[in-house]
Amino acid sequence: MLSLDGENHVIDAGPDFRNQMLIEKVKTLKSVIFTHEHKDHISGLDDVRAFNFKEKREMNVYANAQVQFALHREYHYIFAAKTYPGIPKINIQTIEKESFEIANNTTLTPIEVMHYKLPVLGFRIGDFTYITDAKTISEKEKEKIKGTKILIVNALRKTPHLSHFNLEEALSFIAEIAPEKAYLTHISHLFDKHDNINAVLPERVYAAFDGLQIPFNY
């Protein structure tokens, strides 16, 4: 979740989205920003209805065309010409290749990475970059990341995987970008316990965890 000038924005809403919001005591939410259309990243969208009710407004949803196609399929009742009371109310905004504004004078820059053959979006905001579900990243897209001070990147496990960075690939990418700090996310149960992971990581690289808070400039 990004907390910017008193407003909260989440990147992706997976199956445990509702529980995450309750645990972190999130009272308001300005927007949901999607990286891609896989179920573990979109299946919590229905639960924005609680914020609709509490804040008396539509939820801003940012997604590219391929994600919007999936949302229309999975949540057809949200987009139907005739709807029933209580459905989630969303205001969908299309992510193109250019940077876009999510708060006053605050923009996100989309970064295309490849999740095997599926394009997935990472995002840069100021000196912070978040990337999930990456297996390869083009040199052109890497240029958007250079200069990042805080890098969040996926590292599924130690052994190779078809569509995700493993530990070796993630560490190689981190070394190439050379941020001040890097955090590993999208870690599977096949990896190890957090303390054991941290024990073998290079300096200034850490395993992320639920509830972790990272200050950054935007």
Residue ranges and their predicted role:
Residues P110-I111, I131-D133, V153, T185:
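Thr-Gly-centered strand-to-loop micro-motif
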Residues D16, H38, K135, L156, ...:
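Catalytic metal-binding/acid-base residues of hydrolase active sites
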Residues S138-Y218:
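Binuclear metal-ion centers of metallo-dependent hydrolases, dominated by the metallo-beta-lactamase
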